[in-house]
A protein has these predicted regions:
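N-terminal active-site beta-alpha-beta segment that forms phosphate/nucleotide-binding
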Residues: 65-179
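Surface-exposed, charge/polar-rich loops and edge strands
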Residues: 62-64, 75-78, 83, 129, ...
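Short glycine-/acidic-enriched loop or helix-start segments at secondary-structure transitions
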Residues: 119-122, 146, 193-196, 228-229
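Metal-dependent phosphohydrolase cores
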Residues: 1-61
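Short, solvent-exposed loop/turn segments at secondary-structure junctions
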Residues: 12-13, 18-20, 115, 141, ...
Length: 253
């Protein structure tokens, strides 16, 4: 079988000349090339290298698309008026109070929101009034989350992501996600099928892989939910089985 090789030269590439694919034995130098050609390789090796490069470029493109969606959604959230925000938050609380997951839960985990995110102060008030214990996440070196109880002694620090996180020491008991009754997952954008774009760290994607759907939900403004998924979805991305907006339960288990 004839060896098929790509004859590639930096000068050729910089001048946007065509890449040569040939079935002929290659001399030490190819015509039009100013430097020695690369070693002859089988077509299979070339295909594998091309596939690897294409995969890397495609994955980078997908990440760029998600980052663009994040930036667009942040602008939309920042443009919401305080009045509209509060009105939607109050309606979401009313919907949440009727959910069996909420009614049954004795422990509830939530993440301290940033300014443009869905605010949870009303949720915290409702949880404390109902006698529920609130937990907040702590980031770990392996980019997963563990949870600690939020009580009157809890103090917070701001992480590199700008999120408030509890300050802990060796005396704080740590809980895994599977130990908690209900986990309210933050996010920037959702589809009506439960797809989610978070903030890019992947912490919840890793942490919730083995948590059953019934105990996972998100709270969102209506502008955060779209019927169409126009962003890349990876196998490692978690789905949100229950999403609640001011208009009701978008998707339920």
């Amino acid at each position: 079988e004839w060896a098929k090789v790509w004859a590639i030269d930096h000068e050729m590439l910089s001048n946007e000349l065509p890449i040569i694919l040939t079935d002929e034995p290659i001399m030490e130098k190819a015509p039009l090339l100013s430097s020695p050609i690369l070693e002859e390789r089988s077509m299979r090796a070339v295909e594998l290298e091309f596939l690897k490069l294409f995969t890397e470029l495609f994955e980078a493109y997908q990440k760029d698309v998600k980052n663009l969606k994040r930036a667009q959604q942040k602008r939309e959230l920042e443009a919401m008026t305080p009045g509209k925000r509060r009105a939607e938050e109050k309606r979401v609380v009313e919907w949440l109070k009727g959910m069996p997951q909420w009614i049954e839960a004795k422990t509830v985990a939530l993440t301290m929101p940033m300014r443009m995110e869905f605010q949870l102060d009303l949720i915290v008030q409702e949880a404390r009034s109902a006698g529920k214990t609130i937990f907040v996440p702590v980031t770990m070196p392996d980019k997963t989350l563990v949870f600690v109880e939020w009580n009157e002694q809890t103090t917070f620090k701001r992480t590199s992501y700008g999120v408030l996180e509890p300050v802990i020491d060796s005396t704080h008991p740590l809980f895994e996600a599977k130990d908690l009754d209900l986990i309210i997952v933050p996010g920037l954008l959702y589809s009506t099928k439960g797809d989610r774009i978070g903030f890019g760290g992947g912490y919840y994607d890793r942490t919730l892989q083995k948590v059953d759907d019934y105990r996972i939900l998100s709270l969102a403004y209506t502008t955060q939910v779209t019927p169409a998924v126009d962003w890349p979805v990876f196998e490692t991305d978690i789905h949100i089985p229950t999403i609640i907006t001011s208009e009701g339960v978008v998707r339920d288990v």
